[in-house]
From Swiss-Prot:
Domain of life of the native organism: Eukaryota
Skewed-composition ranges (Acidic residues): 180-194
Name of the molecule in the record: Fasciculation and elongation protein zeta-1
InterPro entries per the UniProt record, alphabetical: FEZ
UniProt source species: Mus musculus
Compartments reported by the entry: Cytoplasm, Cytoskeleton, Microtubule organizing center, Centrosome; Cell membrane
Protein's job: May be involved in axonal outgrowth as component of the network of molecules that regulate cellular morphology and axon guidance machinery. May participate in the transport of mitochondria and other cargos along microtubules.
Disulphide bridges: none
Subunit structure as annotated in this protein's UniProt entry: Homodimer. Interacts with the NH2-terminal variable region (V1) of PKC zeta and weakly with that of PKC epsilon. Interacts with UBE4B and SAP30L. Interacts with SCOC and ULK1; SCOC interferes with ULK1-binding to FEZ1. Directly interacts with SCOC and UVRAG. Stabilizes the interaction between SCOC and UVRAG during amino acid starvation.
Length: 392
Protein backbone atom coordinates (compact mmCIF):
# COMPACT_ATOMS: atom_id res chain seq x y z
CA UNK A 1 0.00 0.00 0.00
CA UNK A 2 1.43 3.33 -1.02
CA UNK A 3 1.86 6.05 1.60
CA UNK A 4 -0.22 9.22 1.02
CA UNK A 5 1.50 12.26 -0.38
CA UNK A 6 1.65 15.47 1.57
CA UNK A 7 1.65 18.85 -0.14
CA UNK A 8 3.14 21.78 1.75
CA UNK A 9 2.73 24.41 -0.98
CA UNK A 10 -0.36 25.96 0.61
CA UNK A 11 1.26 26.26 4.02
CA UNK A 12 4.38 27.96 2.71
CA UNK A 13 2.86 30.28 0.09
CA UNK A 14 3.68 33.27 2.25
CA UNK A 15 7.24 32.11 2.81
CA UNK A 16 8.32 31.75 -0.83
CA UNK A 17 8.12 35.43 -1.84
CA UNK A 18 9.93 36.41 1.30
CA UNK A 19 13.25 35.11 -0.04
CA UNK A 20 14.94 37.18 -2.77
CA UNK A 21 17.87 35.71 -4.58
CA UNK A 22 20.57 37.72 -6.28
CA UNK A 23 22.92 36.22 -8.84
CA UNK A 24 26.10 37.14 -7.07
CA UNK A 25 25.02 37.15 -3.37
CA UNK A 26 23.66 34.56 -1.01
CA UNK A 27 19.89 34.27 -0.61
CA UNK A 28 18.39 36.64 1.96
CA UNK A 29 15.20 35.59 3.78
CA UNK A 30 12.88 37.94 5.59
CA UNK A 31 11.07 35.23 7.53
CA UNK A 32 13.69 32.57 7.47
CA UNK A 33 16.29 31.53 9.94
CA UNK A 34 18.54 33.78 11.94
CA UNK A 35 21.14 35.70 9.99
CA UNK A 36 24.13 34.20 11.77
CA UNK A 37 25.33 30.70 10.92
CA UNK A 38 26.05 28.03 13.45
CA UNK A 39 29.69 27.66 14.17
CA UNK A 40 29.55 23.94 14.85
CA UNK A 41 29.73 21.95 11.57
CA UNK A 42 27.70 19.14 13.13
CA UNK A 43 24.75 21.54 13.58
CA UNK A 44 25.10 23.26 10.19
CA UNK A 45 22.86 20.69 8.55
CA UNK A 46 19.88 22.20 10.42
CA UNK A 47 20.02 25.23 8.08
CA UNK A 48 19.04 23.15 5.07
CA UNK A 49 15.85 21.78 6.69
CA UNK A 50 13.72 24.82 5.81
CA UNK A 51 14.53 24.53 2.10
CA UNK A 52 13.81 20.83 2.02
CA UNK A 53 10.39 21.19 3.66
CA UNK A 54 8.83 22.90 0.62
CA UNK A 55 8.26 19.83 -1.57
CA UNK A 56 5.93 16.92 -2.09
CA UNK A 57 6.73 14.30 0.53
CA UNK A 58 5.03 11.23 1.92
CA UNK A 59 4.43 10.48 5.59
CA UNK A 60 7.24 7.96 5.59
CA UNK A 61 9.68 10.55 4.22
CA UNK A 62 8.65 13.04 6.89
CA UNK A 63 9.19 10.49 9.64
CA UNK A 64 12.59 9.56 8.27
CA UNK A 65 13.64 13.19 8.01
CA UNK A 66 12.47 13.80 11.58
CA UNK A 67 14.63 10.90 12.74
CA UNK A 68 17.57 12.32 10.82
CA UNK A 69 17.06 15.68 12.49
CA UNK A 70 17.03 14.07 15.92
CA UNK A 71 20.18 12.17 15.09
CA UNK A 72 21.85 15.37 13.95
CA UNK A 73 20.82 17.19 17.12
CA UNK A 74 21.91 14.46 19.53
CA UNK A 75 24.81 13.04 17.58
CA UNK A 76 27.62 15.01 19.17
CA UNK A 77 27.17 15.39 22.91
CA UNK A 78 30.29 17.53 23.24
CA UNK A 79 29.05 20.19 20.82
CA UNK A 80 28.94 23.74 22.18
CA UNK A 81 25.38 25.01 22.44
CA UNK A 82 26.00 28.37 24.08
CA UNK A 83 24.86 30.14 20.91
CA UNK A 84 21.52 28.30 21.03
CA UNK A 85 20.89 28.36 24.80
CA UNK A 86 23.35 30.50 26.72
CA UNK A 87 24.17 29.24 30.21
CA UNK A 88 24.59 31.56 33.17
CA UNK A 89 27.96 31.95 34.76
CA UNK A 90 28.72 30.58 38.21
CA UNK A 91 29.02 34.12 39.55
CA UNK A 92 25.52 34.99 38.38
CA UNK A 93 24.14 31.85 40.02
CA UNK A 94 25.87 32.68 43.31
CA UNK A 95 24.56 36.24 43.24
CA UNK A 96 21.00 35.00 42.67
CA UNK A 97 21.33 32.51 45.53
CA UNK A 98 22.60 35.24 47.87
CA UNK A 99 19.73 37.54 46.97
CA UNK A 100 17.26 34.71 47.57
CA UNK A 101 18.78 34.01 50.98
CA UNK A 102 18.13 37.60 52.03
CA UNK A 103 14.51 37.51 50.88
CA UNK A 104 12.07 36.97 53.77
CA UNK A 105 9.28 35.81 51.48
CA UNK A 106 11.50 33.12 49.96
CA UNK A 107 12.58 31.94 53.42
CA UNK A 108 8.97 31.75 54.58
CA UNK A 109 8.02 29.68 51.53
CA UNK A 110 10.97 27.28 51.65
CA UNK A 111 11.14 26.69 55.42
CA UNK A 112 8.06 24.46 55.27
CA UNK A 113 9.72 22.15 52.73
CA UNK A 114 12.97 21.48 54.60
CA UNK A 115 13.30 17.67 55.01
CA UNK A 116 13.67 16.34 58.53
CA UNK A 117 16.98 14.66 59.34
CA UNK A 118 15.29 11.73 61.07
CA UNK A 119 13.53 10.59 57.89
CA UNK A 120 15.27 8.45 55.32
CA UNK A 121 14.19 9.79 51.94
CA UNK A 122 15.54 6.71 50.21
CA UNK A 123 12.61 4.77 51.64
CA UNK A 124 9.85 4.70 48.99
CA UNK A 125 7.13 4.70 51.65
CA UNK A 126 8.22 8.10 53.03
CA UNK A 127 7.23 9.95 49.89
CA UNK A 128 3.80 8.36 49.84
CA UNK A 129 3.22 9.19 53.51
CA UNK A 130 4.33 12.80 53.12
CA UNK A 131 2.29 13.23 49.98
CA UNK A 132 -0.87 11.91 51.58
CA UNK A 133 -0.46 13.60 54.98
CA UNK A 134 -2.05 16.85 53.90
CA UNK A 135 -4.92 14.98 52.25
CA UNK A 136 -5.49 12.96 55.43
CA UNK A 137 -5.49 16.10 57.60
CA UNK A 138 -7.95 17.84 55.28
CA UNK A 139 -10.19 14.76 55.31
CA UNK A 140 -10.11 14.62 59.12
CA UNK A 141 -10.98 18.32 59.41
CA UNK A 142 -13.88 17.87 57.00
CA UNK A 143 -15.16 14.91 59.03
CA UNK A 144 -14.93 16.91 62.28
CA UNK A 145 -16.83 19.84 60.77
CA UNK A 146 -19.47 17.50 59.38
CA UNK A 147 -19.90 15.78 62.75
CA UNK A 148 -20.21 19.13 64.55
CA UNK A 149 -22.84 20.32 62.08
CA UNK A 150 -24.80 17.07 62.36
CA UNK A 151 -24.67 17.22 66.16
CA UNK A 152 -25.88 20.80 66.18
CA UNK A 153 -28.68 20.01 63.75
CA UNK A 154 -29.88 16.87 65.50
CA UNK A 155 -29.50 18.19 69.03
CA UNK A 156 -27.07 15.47 70.07
CA UNK A 157 -24.55 17.95 71.39
CA UNK A 158 -25.81 17.94 74.95
CA UNK A 159 -23.90 18.92 78.04
CA UNK A 160 -22.50 16.02 80.08
CA UNK A 161 -24.17 15.08 83.33
CA UNK A 162 -22.71 16.81 86.35
CA UNK A 163 -22.26 15.47 89.83
CA UNK A 164 -23.96 16.97 92.85
CA UNK A 165 -20.77 18.69 94.01
CA UNK A 166 -20.23 20.29 90.61
CA UNK A 167 -23.82 21.53 90.48
CA UNK A 168 -23.52 22.99 93.97
CA UNK A 169 -20.27 24.75 93.07
CA UNK A 170 -21.84 26.25 89.95
CA UNK A 171 -24.87 27.42 91.94
CA UNK A 172 -22.62 29.04 94.52
CA UNK A 173 -20.60 30.80 91.81
CA UNK A 174 -23.79 32.08 90.17
CA UNK A 175 -25.12 33.33 93.47
CA UNK A 176 -21.84 35.04 94.28
CA UNK A 177 -21.66 36.73 90.88
CA UNK A 178 -25.23 38.07 91.11
CA UNK A 179 -25.35 40.77 93.81
CA UNK A 180 -28.67 41.73 95.38
CA UNK A 181 -29.41 45.49 95.16
CA UNK A 182 -31.98 45.21 97.96
CA UNK A 183 -29.43 43.76 100.35
CA UNK A 184 -26.60 46.18 99.74
CA UNK A 185 -26.83 47.41 103.30
CA UNK A 186 -26.53 43.89 104.64
CA UNK A 187 -23.56 43.30 102.37
CA UNK A 188 -21.94 46.47 103.64
CA UNK A 189 -22.54 45.38 107.21
CA UNK A 190 -21.05 41.99 106.45
CA UNK A 191 -18.06 43.68 104.84
CA UNK A 192 -17.65 45.85 107.90
CA UNK A 193 -17.87 42.77 110.08
CA UNK A 194 -15.35 41.01 107.86
CA UNK A 195 -13.01 43.99 108.09
CA UNK A 196 -13.37 44.00 111.88
CA UNK A 197 -12.68 40.27 112.03
CA UNK A 198 -9.70 40.67 109.70
CA UNK A 199 -8.43 43.49 111.87
CA UNK A 200 -8.87 41.31 114.95
CA UNK A 201 -7.02 38.51 113.21
CA UNK A 202 -4.21 40.89 112.31
CA UNK A 203 -4.04 42.09 115.91
CA UNK A 204 -3.87 38.51 117.10
CA UNK A 205 -1.13 37.76 114.62
CA UNK A 206 0.85 40.77 115.77
CA UNK A 207 0.48 39.72 119.39
CA UNK A 208 1.53 36.21 118.50
CA UNK A 209 4.61 37.47 116.68
CA UNK A 210 5.52 39.70 119.61
CA UNK A 211 5.10 36.81 122.02
CA UNK A 212 7.21 34.51 119.89
CA UNK A 213 9.97 37.12 119.79
CA UNK A 214 9.90 37.48 123.57
CA UNK A 215 9.81 33.73 123.96
CA UNK A 216 12.79 33.30 121.69
CA UNK A 217 14.71 36.05 123.44
CA UNK A 218 13.79 35.38 127.08
CA UNK A 219 12.51 31.85 127.38
CA UNK A 220 15.75 30.35 128.35
CA UNK A 221 17.06 29.49 131.74
CA UNK A 222 19.43 32.43 131.77
CA UNK A 223 16.87 34.88 130.37
CA UNK A 224 14.18 33.97 132.90
CA UNK A 225 16.73 34.05 135.66
CA UNK A 226 17.72 37.62 134.88
CA UNK A 227 14.06 38.83 134.62
CA UNK A 228 12.42 40.56 137.56
CA UNK A 229 9.18 39.47 139.21
CA UNK A 230 7.12 42.25 137.61
CA UNK A 231 8.41 41.35 134.17
CA UNK A 232 7.53 37.70 134.74
CA UNK A 233 3.98 38.54 135.88
CA UNK A 234 3.51 40.83 132.88
CA UNK A 235 4.72 38.11 130.54
CA UNK A 236 2.40 35.60 132.20
CA UNK A 237 -0.60 37.90 131.77
CA UNK A 238 0.21 38.41 128.10
CA UNK A 239 0.50 34.68 127.52
CA UNK A 240 -2.80 33.95 129.29
CA UNK A 241 -4.58 36.70 127.32
CA UNK A 242 -3.21 35.35 124.04
CA UNK A 243 -4.34 31.84 124.97
CA UNK A 244 -7.88 33.09 125.70
CA UNK A 245 -8.06 35.03 122.44
CA UNK A 246 -6.75 32.15 120.38
CA UNK A 247 -9.13 29.73 122.08
CA UNK A 248 -12.14 31.92 121.28
CA UNK A 249 -11.02 32.26 117.67
CA UNK A 250 -10.52 28.52 117.42
CA UNK A 251 -14.02 27.83 118.77
CA UNK A 252 -15.48 30.35 116.32
CA UNK A 253 -13.68 28.81 113.34
CA UNK A 254 -14.72 25.29 114.35
CA UNK A 255 -18.35 26.37 114.61
CA UNK A 256 -18.10 28.01 111.20
CA UNK A 257 -16.63 24.83 109.76
CA UNK A 258 -19.49 22.75 111.20
CA UNK A 259 -22.03 25.15 109.68
CA UNK A 260 -20.39 24.90 106.27
CA UNK A 261 -20.26 21.11 106.42
CA UNK A 262 -23.95 20.94 107.39
CA UNK A 263 -24.85 23.33 104.56
CA UNK A 264 -22.89 21.18 102.13
CA UNK A 265 -24.71 18.04 103.27
CA UNK A 266 -28.10 19.75 102.86
CA UNK A 267 -27.21 20.88 99.33
CA UNK A 268 -25.94 17.43 98.38
CA UNK A 269 -29.11 15.75 99.62
CA UNK A 270 -31.25 18.32 97.76
CA UNK A 271 -29.44 17.74 94.45
CA UNK A 272 -29.55 13.96 94.89
CA UNK A 273 -33.30 13.83 95.58
CA UNK A 274 -33.99 16.26 92.73
CA UNK A 275 -32.13 14.05 90.23
CA UNK A 276 -33.96 10.94 91.47
CA UNK A 277 -37.36 12.63 91.09
CA UNK A 278 -36.49 13.78 87.56
CA UNK A 279 -35.44 10.25 86.59
CA UNK A 280 -38.69 8.79 87.94
CA UNK A 281 -40.73 11.41 86.11
CA UNK A 282 -38.95 10.51 82.89
CA UNK A 283 -39.64 6.81 83.43
CA UNK A 284 -43.31 7.53 84.12
CA UNK A 285 -43.63 9.58 80.91
CA UNK A 286 -42.14 6.75 78.87
CA UNK A 287 -44.49 4.27 80.55
CA UNK A 288 -47.51 6.46 79.80
CA UNK A 289 -46.50 6.69 76.14
CA UNK A 290 -46.30 2.90 75.90
CA UNK A 291 -49.69 2.54 77.56
CA UNK A 292 -51.25 5.03 75.17
CA UNK A 293 -49.89 3.13 72.20
CA UNK A 294 -51.17 -0.17 73.57
CA UNK A 295 -54.53 1.40 74.36
CA UNK A 296 -54.82 2.80 70.83
CA UNK A 297 -54.03 -0.60 69.32
CA UNK A 298 -56.56 -2.32 71.60
CA UNK A 299 -59.24 0.24 70.68
CA UNK A 300 -58.64 -0.36 66.98
CA UNK A 301 -58.90 -4.12 67.44
CA UNK A 302 -62.10 -3.72 69.48
CA UNK A 303 -63.62 -1.52 66.78
CA UNK A 304 -62.83 -4.10 64.15
CA UNK A 305 -64.40 -6.85 66.25
CA UNK A 306 -67.47 -4.75 67.02
CA UNK A 307 -67.88 -3.89 63.36
CA UNK A 308 -67.89 -7.56 62.43
CA UNK A 309 -70.51 -8.36 65.08
CA UNK A 310 -74.04 -6.96 65.19
CA UNK A 311 -74.77 -5.16 68.45
CA UNK A 312 -77.69 -6.77 70.24
CA UNK A 313 -78.22 -4.05 72.82
CA UNK A 314 -77.43 -0.36 72.81
CA UNK A 315 -76.60 -0.22 76.56
CA UNK A 316 -75.54 -2.84 79.06
CA UNK A 317 -74.69 -2.89 82.75
CA UNK A 318 -71.09 -3.91 82.04
CA UNK A 319 -70.52 -0.92 79.77
CA UNK A 320 -72.03 1.51 82.28
CA UNK A 321 -69.82 0.15 85.09
CA UNK A 322 -66.69 0.51 82.94
CA UNK A 323 -67.56 4.14 82.17
CA UNK A 324 -68.11 4.92 85.88
CA UNK A 325 -64.82 3.29 86.91
CA UNK A 326 -62.81 5.21 84.31
CA UNK A 327 -64.40 8.50 85.42
CA UNK A 328 -63.59 7.79 89.08
CA UNK A 329 -59.95 7.02 88.19
CA UNK A 330 -59.60 10.26 86.26
CA UNK A 331 -61.18 12.28 89.09
CA UNK A 332 -59.50 10.81 92.18
CA UNK A 333 -56.28 9.56 90.68
CA UNK A 334 -55.33 6.31 89.04
CA UNK A 335 -54.57 3.22 91.04
CA UNK A 336 -51.96 0.55 90.64
CA UNK A 337 -48.51 1.51 89.43
CA UNK A 338 -49.47 5.12 88.58
CA UNK A 339 -48.10 7.69 91.00
CA UNK A 340 -50.35 10.44 92.23
CA UNK A 341 -47.89 12.97 93.71
CA UNK A 342 -44.83 12.39 91.52
CA UNK A 343 -45.64 15.19 89.07
CA UNK A 344 -46.52 17.76 91.72
CA UNK A 345 -45.48 21.30 90.75
CA UNK A 346 -43.57 23.18 93.46
CA UNK A 347 -43.94 26.98 93.22
CA UNK A 348 -40.63 28.80 93.38
CA UNK A 349 -39.84 32.49 93.37
CA UNK A 350 -36.46 33.35 91.89
CA UNK A 351 -34.54 35.76 94.09
CA UNK A 352 -31.20 37.42 93.79
CA UNK A 353 -30.00 35.84 97.04
CA UNK A 354 -29.43 32.08 97.26
CA UNK A 355 -31.96 29.98 99.20
CA UNK A 356 -31.22 29.50 102.85
CA UNK A 357 -30.49 26.19 104.50
CA UNK A 358 -34.01 26.05 105.99
CA UNK A 359 -35.57 26.58 102.54
CA UNK A 360 -33.43 23.82 101.07
CA UNK A 361 -34.45 21.48 103.88
CA UNK A 362 -38.15 22.11 103.20
CA UNK A 363 -37.68 21.57 99.46
CA UNK A 364 -35.75 18.38 100.13
CA UNK A 365 -38.57 17.02 102.30
CA UNK A 366 -41.15 17.81 99.59
CA UNK A 367 -39.05 16.12 96.90
CA UNK A 368 -38.47 13.07 99.08
CA UNK A 369 -42.23 12.75 99.69
CA UNK A 370 -42.88 13.09 95.94
CA UNK A 371 -40.38 10.34 95.22
CA UNK A 372 -42.03 8.01 97.74
CA UNK A 373 -45.55 9.09 96.58
CA UNK A 374 -46.39 10.00 100.16
CA UNK A 375 -49.67 11.57 101.21
CA UNK A 376 -47.78 14.27 103.13
CA UNK A 377 -46.98 16.14 99.91
CA UNK A 378 -49.97 18.55 100.13
CA UNK A 379 -49.23 19.35 103.79
CA UNK A 380 -45.52 19.96 103.17
CA UNK A 381 -46.30 22.05 100.12
CA UNK A 382 -48.75 24.20 102.10
CA UNK A 383 -46.18 24.80 104.85
CA UNK A 384 -43.58 25.77 102.26
CA UNK A 385 -45.93 28.28 100.61
CA UNK A 386 -46.97 29.87 103.92
CA UNK A 387 -43.47 30.08 105.41
CA UNK A 388 -41.30 30.86 102.39
CA UNK A 389 -43.36 32.31 99.55
CA UNK A 390 -46.05 34.13 101.53
CA UNK A 391 -44.72 34.68 105.04
CA UNK A 392 -47.15 36.38 107.42
Amino acid sequence: MEAPLVSLDEEFEDIRPSCTEEPEEKPQCLYGTSPHHLEDPSLSELENFSSEIISFKSMEDLVNEFDEKLNVCFRNYNAKTESLAPVKNQLQIQEEEETLRDEEVWDALTDNYIPSLSEDWRDPNIEALNGNSSDIEIHEKEEEEFNEKSENDSGINEEPLLTADQVIEEIEEMMQNSPDPEEEEEVLEEEDGGEISSQADSVLLQEMQALTQTFNNNWSYEGLRHMSGSELTELLDRVEGAIRDFSEELVHQLARRDELEFEKEVKNSFITVLIEVQNKQREQRELMKKRRKEKGLSLQSNRIEKGSQMPLKRFSMEGISNILQSGIRQTFGSSGADRQYLNTVIPYEKKSSPPSVEDLQMLTNILFAMKEDNEKVPTLLTDYILKVLCPT
